């Protein structure tokens, strides 16, 4: 199905082939994942469906052991990979947001390309709807993220630092088979959490304040991304009020998600609740984003997105209020859009 949609797009744009070099996009189509560093790793998909993977010679055996069953062209560091494939293309579709001007010139020289088109949106649209296999992997990543929060909460005590909690979570979760986090784990105490993308440091935990955890893990290349703001003791009334508003905004936004609903309308639901409570200026970001091979991917859950939710999408819902000197609260869940509504894949208590 993936390959068919690429070849259909090639025909639609009257192009000869697609040239894909983003490692995660290559993995999406081939099942082979590699970080080539400065070396070229590229997937060529021709209009007849044939696939050619260019890779360093040192990776050829790994490629052949992967699910990829197309042609493999390995090259030495002393060779120009493009010289090893003799073909001419009139029009080539590329990832326009990723292709460098230098690489474009090399493609023109090697393949005689006369014009370029964009394949980015087609790939984004494909990756936006997850297969059953992808969903199962994301679910497992979410279960492990829940476990991370559990580990972190159990480690809280007066005097512990943000950095110590981060280190404890990332060490202990390895016992569950986790080798990589989706992004740098965030643990922020009290008013330090009023910086939405703050950096954990030596701030010590005090009694009666909130603790914000924002984290995710990678399971078989798929990401989770969740946030919980938990009580340590009894936070003051103002901080609790902020928490209650954020929780209401998140719950009502999630309740509205189902196929056919306009994405911006869900952002509006959360934003209106926060604004009506008097905190609109303290909610400075979109409501959420797509989730899959990357922790942030297509589509944005924002007030400008007029697309509709579709079954198979996985998105985050993460309203927040950040009042300097008072508190920062964000609550985030990973949501699967189902045929009749939605399912929350993250489940740690709120």
UniProtKB/Swiss-Prot annotation:
E.C. designation(s): 3.4.-.-
Name used for this protein in its record: Uncharacterized peptidase SSP1059
Binding site for Mn(2+) 2: 214, 225, 332
Residues bound to Mn(2+) 1: 225, 289, 318, 332
Keywords (A to Z) from UniProt: Hydrolase, Manganese, Metal-binding
Domain of life (superkingdom): Bacteria
Species of the source: Staphylococcus saprophyticus subsp. saprophyticus (strain ATCC 15305 / DSM 20229 / NCIMB 8711 / NCTC 7292 / S-41)
GO molecular function, one term: metal ion binding
Obligatory cofactor(s): Mn(2+)
